[in-house]
Amino acid sequence: MLRSAVRLAGKDVRFGEDARRSMQKGVTRAVAAVATTLGPKGRNVII
């Protein structure tokens, strides 16, 4: 049986402006990853 080693990050709770900036940074990265993999018809997304 194959076992994959997965390390999960600890919880990082943020509030206010710091939370908004962190969320925006993650959304921007996701948009950049999806935008480059949409393909000719826009049906395929690989992240």
UniProtKB/Swiss-Prot annotation:
It is found in: Mitochondrion matrix. One of its GO terms (cellular component) is mitochondrial matrix. The keyword Mitochondrion applies. The keyword Transport does not apply. Gene3D superfamilies: GroEL-like equatorial domain. Induction: By heat shock. It comes from the Eukaryota. Its main location: mitochondrion. Keywords: ATP-binding, Chaperone, Mitochondrion, Nucleotide-binding, Stress response, Transit peptide. One of its GO terms (molecular function) is ATP binding. Residues 1-8 form a transit peptide. Implicated in mitochondrial protein import and macromolecular assembly. May facilitate the correct folding of imported proteins. May also prevent misfolding and promote the refolding and proper assembly of unfolded polypeptides generated under stress conditions in the mitochondrial matrix. Belongs to the chaperonin (HSP60) family. This is Chaperonin HSP60, mitochondrial.
